[in-house]
């Protein structure tokens, strides 16, 4: 009985994780500029692949495999914000502008910072 | 339905959804107007590939795939960091910056005619 419940939970987590990944990809295509696309890719994308890794670990019913999957999940959750932040900061410093629809940009550009 | 059938169906659905996500991401990489968009697409591609590997691990029962997913995550992180450093070092791509001026064009895809004329006048 417990095994059946675990199988159902794994199936549910797998479909939910794949849905998160698909929504992240849709956001990547539909959002207007780099900085909004980054939201979709680094939040929904991380949750999607993390849930799928968690499902794989849960399905194995093996502590060693589960811990490894969890370690991969934690590693991914730790590194995705770092890489996204670094990429956004680099693009902003290089001078890539936000879309015209965005409301506020509080980080000064390099030229503006020098002028002040 | 037996649990095995449910798992098989769920992994099939997940594979289809992840393939769609992969296609959309590749579309963004091809269309991406700037280099950071493409780098972001590659980062997303790595994330989806990790999910795909996890689903295949469930489907086939080879849990060694999870180690491959961890290694792929490490490589993807390092690649994104390296690309970010490259973007920082390169600045805007040459076709976006009007040559001869320090002004960065405000969300203009091509250098304006006025900038070109100004540059000719300077010569």
Curated annotation (Swiss-Prot), chain A:
Task: Write out the transmembrane intervals.
Answer: none
Checking InterPro entries in the record gives:
PhaG_MnhG_YufB
Alphabetically, the GO molecular function entries are: sodium:proton antiporter activity
- What protein family is recorded? Belongs to the UPF0091 family.
| Name of the protein in its database record | UPF0091 protein R00998
UniProtKB/Swiss-Prot annotation, chain B:
Any idea which UniProt keywords this protein has? Answer: Cell membrane, Membrane, Transmembrane, Transmembrane helix, Transport
Gene symbol? phaF2
Q: Name one GO cellular component term.
A: plasma membrane
NCBIfam families assigned to the protein according to its UniProt record, in alphabetical order: PRK12599.1-4
User: Where in the cell is the protein located?
Assistant: Cell membrane
Q: Is Transmembrane helix among this UniProt entry's keywords?
A: yes
The UniProt entry's sequence similarity note says: Belongs to the CPA3 antiporters (TC 2.A.63) subunit F family.
**Tagged with keyword Transport:** yes
A GO term for molecular function: sodium:proton antiporter activity
- Membrane topology recorded in Swiss-Prot or TrEMBL: Multi-pass membrane protein
Q: Which residues cross the membrane?
A: 4-24, 38-58, 64-84
Q: In its UniProt entry, what is this protein called? A: PhaF2 protein
Span list, region Disordered: 95-123
């Amino acid at each position: 009985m417990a095994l059946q419940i675990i199988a159902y939970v794994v199936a549910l987590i797998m479909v939910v994780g794949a849905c998160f990944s698909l929504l992240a990809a849709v956001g990547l295509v539909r959002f207007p500029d780099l900085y909004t696309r980054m939201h979709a890719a680094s939040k929904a994308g991380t949750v999607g692949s993390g849930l799928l890794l968690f499902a794989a670990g849960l399905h194995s019913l093996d502590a060693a495999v589960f811990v490894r999957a969890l370690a991969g999940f934690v590693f991914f959750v730790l590194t995705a914000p770092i890489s996204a932040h670094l990429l956004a900061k680099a693009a902003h410093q290089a001078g890539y502008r936000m879309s015209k629809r965005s409301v506020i940009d509080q980080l000064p550009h390099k030229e503006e910072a020098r002028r002040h | 339905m037996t649990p095995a059938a449910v798992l098989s169906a769920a992994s099939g659905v997940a594979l289809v959804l992840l393939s769609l996500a992969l296609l959309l991401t590749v579309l963004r990489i091809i269309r991406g107007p700037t280099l950071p968009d493409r780098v972001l697409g590659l980062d997303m591609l790595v994330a989806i590939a990790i999910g795909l590997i996890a689903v295949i691990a469930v489907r086939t029962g080879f849990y060694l795939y999870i180690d491959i997913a961890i290694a792929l995550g490490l490589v993807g992180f390092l690649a994104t960091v390296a690309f970010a450093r490259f973007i920082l070092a390169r600045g805007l791509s040459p076709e976006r910056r009007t040559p001869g001026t320090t002004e960065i064009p405000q969300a203009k895809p091509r250098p304006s005619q006025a900038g070109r004329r100004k540059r000719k006048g300077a010569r």
